[in-house]
Amino acid sequence: MTTILTVRKGNQVVVGGDGQVSLGNTVMKGNARKVRRLYRGEVIAGFAGGTADAFTLFERFEGQLEKHQGHLVRAAVDLAKDWRSDRALRKLEAMLIVANKESTLIITGTGDVVEPQHGALAIGSGGNFAEAAARALIDNTDLTAKEIVEKSLNIAADICVFTNHSLTIEEITIDAQLEDKSK
């Protein structure tokens, strides 16, 4: 599988993931790009699960973002509805983490759209390791969100055999006005 982690701290939202693609117990590729920008660069999305399935979901999600003019929550809810009700989509085995300046969400194939309670959220085989590390670093260090994502993904890669150290990290800087509204 893989590990995708997002951290929201200060004026940063960061999503990162490793690059390992496995087929069973065999590493097929080590530098896949599982985190990418969508909707004019305003949204960052990362996937864990089947690569082909994830690309299908990226396309569908980007379509929903266009339909809802970049409104992340509406697009996520509509994707989750489609994913749950469409026979072909229901068979897709992947999960998405999506984030913009206002929200961070996880979207699952069972129709769940969840916003994290804490500043970190992770999916994939190494997700629990990465999220635990990130939460500890958020609470106990002055590291930036990007530094936390990098360190946490490396910890997950040290523990999880389906996660490697080839990282893709994307970040969004939150405007001061938006940051004030969220407090």
Swiss-Prot record:
What residues sit in the active site?
2
* Name this polypeptide is given: ATP-dependent protease subunit HslV
Quaternary structure and partners = A double ring-shaped homohexamer of HslV is capped on each side by a ring-shaped HslU homohexamer. The assembly of the HslU/HslV complex is dependent on binding of ATP.
Give the regulation of activity: Allosterically activated by HslU binding.
* Catalysis: reaction(s): ATP-dependent cleavage of peptide bonds with broad specificity
GO molecular-function annotation terms? Answer: metal ion binding; threonine-type endopeptidase activity
**Source species:** Marinomonas sp. (strain MWYL1)
Write down the top EC class of this protein. Answer: hydrolase
Q: Which residues bind Na(+)?
A: 157, 160, 163
Q: Which gene encodes it?
A: hslV
